[in-house]
Amino acid sequence: MKSEHLLGTSIPRFTYDTPTVPGNDFYALCEGEHPLCMIFLPGFDHPVSREYITRYLKTLPQLKGARLVCVVRSSAQAVAKATHGSDSPFPVICDGPGVLYGYLGVEQTRGLLSWSFAAQKIYKAARDAGYHYDTKAPQLLPLTLVVGHLGKILFTHSGRSQTDLPEDCAAISEIVRAVEKATAPTDGPADPHCSDETLTLPDLVGWDN
């Protein structure tokens, strides 16, 4: 299932945990001068997640006119343990149960079907470093969203491979600038019913938007 049907809809208000702060308001995160670029990754310990989060950290000075949020399929406790409780310069939303992934229809595929050449290089480096993985296991594909006020989805891209996502913060800035330019004349308010109630991530299960 592709993600184009999400364009123009609104993500309901919910609270989320980061590795260091629980119970954050998603709509408060959406407020700001520039839209959010939300990038959905596999678990925090997955080689692809580690590779791209590292790239974003290294290229953060190139993030101009945009804001970045990474979503990982890991619990806040697991990420806090892996990072020794250190803060990230951009929010990392921890969705261990995968509620957001299910709500937004984040796709997965089996094994080698999702392995781009870049992914093969990432896996080889991880294997050489001692990481073991099941080549036949289903793999989450990345989802990139640009989100405005009240959770309105302004842009969506479902990755066709595990590395089909913005390669660095410069690419993120370019995407957000293009989206702002394209949506500025017609960007209307988000569906007001979505801001009436603050949900927790589990509350999104079965939500009918």
Predicted regions, residues:
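Conserved beta-strand and immediately adjacent loop positions that scaffold enzyme active sites
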Residues: 13, 36, 143
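Residue-level preference for short coil/turn positions at secondary-structure junctions
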Residues: 7, 31-34, 64, 140
